[in-house]
Amino acid sequence: MTSKKLTEKPLKRRRFMKTAVGLTLAPIAIGLWGCGGSNSTSTSSTASNSSSSNNDTDSNAEPEEDFDGWASGGTSAMTSDFPDDSLFDTASVCSVALTGSQTEGPCYFQSDYLDDISYEQTGLPMMLCLQLIDEACNPLSGYEIEVWHCDVDGVYSGDTSDSADASGFNSAFCTGNEVDALSAKWFRGIAVTDASGRINLKSCFPGWYSSRAIHIHFRIRRNNTDQLVSQFGFSDSFCQDICTNHPDYSHRGEPDTLL
């Protein structure tokens, strides 16, 4: 699949994470591009665009040359704008494949409409760019796309006080009953697709928790009706690189579960 590069500094470049996802409906398919980092492949039961036809969502990225290590400092360290729609360019002929649903999991509760979902938490800055298209590769506007994931320590936020739907949330499991997590809403957010079928979110690369590979949950809604609930993840080597070399992740070491 295609990959892009993100240059953050003219002299010493640090690797930010820029992730682009192409989501298609009717039938639903998903393609994932990661930019500014190592090659990565997701774990969700999805299929990529015409550049790849396996049963995984692929996230391919070329490492920056002469980089000065992974960026840190959370979303406040971002110095570049979101990339234009050429990020999603693939083949000249439209070809999509089915995306399977994945479990919602026990850590979901409905969140807020946000551009930056980090709530000033630390971590590897990540641009999450998602584009929703139909089976003819036409963009779909007016759809809600919601994402949620854990922090660098593998902990989910747990402040459900303003949530319209927290019926399935397992607070003890997801927050570990940590005081900070119980009062937080970090790494959760909703955005509505624009005329290009696209949303842009600022976040940080998620950490890991026992028995799960690193992943991000997402759901797509139209007129308050779920169109898809699923997850995507990243290749073992990509996650190992971050968890071994990034100061915000290295204290926990490599994930205990890989793809």
What do these predicted ranges mean?
Residues 30, 50-51, 66, 109:
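A generic alpha-helix propensity feature with a strong bias for hydrophobic helices
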Residues 35-43:
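Bacterial lipoprotein signal-peptidase II cleavage site
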Residues 42-60:
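Ser/Thr-rich, Pro/Gly/Ala-heavy low-complexity intrinsically disordered linkers and tails
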Residues 1-15, 21-33:
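N-terminal secretory signal peptides
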Residues 60-259:
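Beta-strand-dominated extracellular/periplasmic modules and repeats
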Residues 7, 11-14, 51, 56, ...:
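Residue-level detector of intrinsically disordered/flexible regions characterized by low predicted structural confidence
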